[in-house]
Amino acid sequence: MATLEQNLQQMLQGSVEDLGCELWGIECQRAGRFMTVRLYIDKEGGVTVDDCADVSRQVSAILDVEDPIADKYNLEVSSPGLDRPLFTLEQFQRYVGQEISVHLRIPMLDRRKWQGKLERIEGDMLTLIVDDQEQSFALSNIQKANVIPKF
């Protein structure tokens, strides 16, 4: 069964691309009776405020017609930022060699949070170098991942 994020991704991706942007990812977070639906968009050269506004208007119209969210919600549209979240295998592959953080669904070695250099991806496993040691994680066990920006 597909998640709400997966359903929204499928529903909205084409419209976002028609506006010249990539739908980087979607997060849905519940807070009490309300939900926040957060869309991350990206494009070559960077995302502008006008891009976010255009995507927000387009997506709002689609969600009003399709009505896929049963609860009241707030829609947020933004760029992924420097510490961008990673949602897909392809996105992880773009950042091999860079520092990332991962939050696991099921702890490994009594830890849920890990940070290290993304060394490689093989199949559905990614390997980080953490404190000069290799640690491998199943993509299915990663709840959240972010790029650690270099300054």
From Swiss-Prot:
InterPro entries: Ribosome_maturation_RimP, RimP_C, RimP_C_sf, RimP_N, RimP_N_sf. Pfam families: DUF150_C, RimP_N. Keywords: Cytoplasm, Ribosome biogenesis. SUPFAM superfamilies: YhbC-like, C-terminal domain, YhbC-like, N-terminal domain. It is found in: Cytoplasm. GO terms for cellular component: cytosol. GO terms for biological process: ribosomal small subunit assembly; translation. Belongs to the RimP family. Required for maturation of 30S ribosomal subunits. This is Ribosome maturation factor RimP. The gene is rimP.
